[in-house]
């Protein structure tokens, strides 16, 4: 097979120069043009020569592949032309490539999809856990706030109750102080009144005795009797 390909390559190379031989004649047939810029003309010729060489190289490779021993053997085996055998071989090669790609994708993609699915599920689980934790914290904060409102209301109620009780106690204490002061004042006034009465009675008794002694002459026994009677009467009035 390789010997036949080696034999066909010189034939293709010989056929390629044969196909290129008419080109100088065609170029000679072209009329000469007046060149104003030598550098531009040289660059244009080099570009055309490069494109022509690339095209000839691609055409040569294409011809070598099309007229290879394998393609010719396949053409003989299938009973078709070399051109048809070439396209059948190309289609078969593409089919093999696509089959290998499909097999590789079928073998590797399930694992990739599984890993990706697991990663997505793990991310969803983590997001759900974070959401549940955030909800739990929010519920805890709301419960604390509601409890705090209740505690504040209870403290306010206790404070108001204690304030009312303290106000009542202060009022009662003030009333008791006023009552005690009034009673003390009344007692002092009563005591002063009684003392004044005793003083007046004593003064009146003294004056009466003095007046009586001046008007009447009594003996000592009568005088003592009058004094005892006055003292007894004074003791009754002082109670």
From Swiss-Prot:
Annotated segments matching region Disordered = 1-64
Protein location? Cell inner membrane
Residue stretches of biased makeup (Basic and acidic residues): 23-33, 45-64
Principal subcellular localisation of the protein? membrane
GO cellular component terms, semicolon-separated:
plasma membrane; proton-transporting ATP synthase complex
Which UniProt key words apply to this protein? Answer: ATP synthesis, Cell inner membrane, Cell membrane, CF(0), Hydrogen ion transport, Ion transport, Membrane, Transmembrane, Transmembrane helix, Transport
Identify the InterPro entries for this entry: ATP_synth_b/b'su_bac/chlpt (IPR002146), ATP_synthase_B_chain (IPR050059)
| Stretches with biased composition (Low complexity) | 1-22
Q: One Pfam family this chain carries?
A: ATP-synt_B
Q: Which residues cross the membrane?
A: 85-105
What membrane topology is annotated for this entry? Single-pass membrane protein
Q: Name one GO molecular function term.
A: proton-transporting ATPase activity, rotational mechanism
Record family assignment: Belongs to the ATPase B chain family.
Question: Subunit details for this protein?
Answer: F-type ATPases have 2 components, F(1) - the catalytic core - and F(0) - the membrane proton channel. F(1) has five subunits: alpha(3), beta(3), gamma(1), delta(1), epsilon(1). F(0) has three main subunits: a(1), b(2) and c(10-14). The alpha and beta chains form an alternating ring which encloses part of the gamma chain. F(1) is attached to F(0) by a central stalk formed by the gamma and epsilon chains, while a peripheral stalk is formed by the delta and b chains.
Return the HAMAP family for the record: ATP_synth_b_bprime (MF_01398)
Functional note: F(1)F(0) ATP synthase produces ATP from ADP in the presence of a proton or sodium gradient. F-type ATPases consist of two structural domains, F(1) containing the extramembraneous catalytic core and F(0) containing the membrane proton channel, linked together by a central stalk and a peripheral stalk. During catalysis, ATP synthesis in the catalytic domain of F(1) is coupled via a rotary mechanism of the central stalk subunits to proton translocation.
**What is this protein called in UniProt?**
ATP synthase subunit b
Query: Species name for this entry?
Result: Koribacter versatilis (strain Ellin345)
